[in-house]
Curated annotation (Swiss-Prot):
Its EC number is 4.2.3.4. Pfam families: DHQ_synthase (PF01761), DHQS_C (PF24621). It is found in: Cytoplasm. Its cofactor is Co(2+); Zn(2+); NAD(+). Disulfide bonds: none annotated. Belongs to the sugar phosphate cyclases superfamily. Dehydroquinate synthase family. Pathway: Metabolic intermediate biosynthesis; chorismate biosynthesis; chorismate from D-erythrose 4-phosphate and phosphoenolpyruvate: step 2/7. This is 3-dehydroquinate synthase. It comes from Shewanella halifaxensis (strain HAW-EB4). Binds 1 divalent metal cation per subunit. Can use either Co(2+) or Zn(2+).
Length: 359
């Protein structure tokens, strides 16, 4: 049975279809593909697993030769995105084209940005294959590539026409990638839904064993929360920034260690602990909240400490480039309890240094 979550954005509203064996039926996508050319963008890891199934699903439609990119965060670059543009141009594909992102967050972000940019905008569809992309990056219209000086620094807000989430894809996901996705799942509980956080605490083993019902509930609940937040604040002027819990610290880890060395979710996990510790130092939460957050992340085998090789100066160098910085002031998303968070711009460098040195 398929679960549908609707992201309501007026004329740009779109459905998120969640279920099993969704690659066997093109019906959820058909309305977006009629009289269109289709270009699938995927990577070298996903192509052998799912490209043939998706092409078979779309056999009644006009599919161009797909683009198969290298796999990894280190390839989330303008250079690789240019390969998408080259394929579009070499195959004479115009504005009547739909790009389909078949892969994880890197493929989704690059394909979405290419769609936003090509001939000033063509349609695109997300088919996320990793847990992280299913619960987070495929929903909400954030598209981007990295720059050597910062993560996701070049991009656009551009919503997909549809998101198709087949939970069967998680059966081929490496355990490390699954754990990385759980960092984003846990984030939703911390910032928005205390009951969901408690449910996660009670269902660790079910999720780690890929129990179908547990996975579908977790994914759908995350998508519901993400949709609710995006509907309130599509372009991250206010409440949507809460979705960046752990990301200011996490992006610093990714940039300093080298993109792809730490997975995004791993860096977010360590960053979430640092954010919780900062909250504790400010008196926003007591030690028990920090312990609950840390214990749940650790239960999914996620890192809960920063890299030993990173010092405060390395952190702050990258954190100052964060997209939430306003008038030169660092703005941090910090837990205020389980199920609630806030944005703080009055955290001193001295306090941050104390937290980072303790981590």
């Amino acid at each position: 049975m398929t679960k549908q979550v609707l992201v309501e954005l007026g004329e740009r509203s779109y459905p998120i279809e969640i279920g099993q064996n969704l690659f066997s039926n093109s019906e959820p996508l058909a309305r977006y593909l009629q009289h269109k050319n289709i270009l699938i963008v995927t990577n070298e890891t996903i192509a052998p697993l799912y490209l043939q199934s998706v092409e078979a699903m779309l056999s009644d439609f006009a599919c161009a030769t797909p683009v198969i990119l290298p796999d990894g965060e280190q390839y989330k670059t303008l250079e690789q995105m240019n390969a998408i543009f080259t394929s579009l141009l070499e195959q004479n594909l115009g504005r009547d084209t739909v790009l389909i992102a078949l892969g994880g967050g890197v493929i989704g972000d690059m394909t979405g940005f290419a769609a936003a940019s090509y001939q000033r905008g063509v349609d695109f569809i997300q088919i996320p294959t990793t847990l992280l992309s299913q619960v987070d990056s495929s929903v909400g219209g954030k598209t981007a590539v990295n720059h050597p000086l910062g993560k996701n620094m070049i991009g656009a807000f551009y919503q997909p026409k549809c998101v198709l989430i087949d939970t069967n894809c998680l059966s081929t996901l490496p355990k490390r990638e699954f754990a990385a996705g759980m960092a984003e799942v846990i984030k939703y509980g911390v910032i928005w839904d205390a009951e969901f956080f408690q449910w996660l605490e009670n269902n660790v083993e079910a999720l780690k064993s890929l129990d179908t019902q547990a996975l579908e509930y977790a994914i759908s609940r995350c998508c519901e929360i993400k949709a609710e937040v995006v509907e309130k604040d599509e372009t991250e002027q206010a409440v949507r920034a809460l979705l960046n819990l752990g990301h200011t610290f996490g992006h610093a880890i990714e940039a300093e260690m080298g993109y792809g060395v730490w997975l995004h979710g791993e860096a977010v996990s360590a960053g979430t602990v640092l954010a919780a510790m900062t909250s504790n130092k400010l008196g926003l939460v007591d030690e028990s909240i920090v312990c609950r957050i840390t214990a749940l992340l650790a239960a999914f085998d996620l890192p809960i400490t920063a890299p030993e090789t990173m010092d405060f100066e390395q952190f702050i160098k990258h954190m100052r480039r964060d997209k939430k910085v306003l008038k030169g002031q660092l703005r941090l998303v910090l837990p205020e309890g389980i199920g609630q968070a806030g944005i703080y711009s009055d955290v001193t460098d001295e306090l941050l240094e104390e937290v980072i040195n303790c981590a």
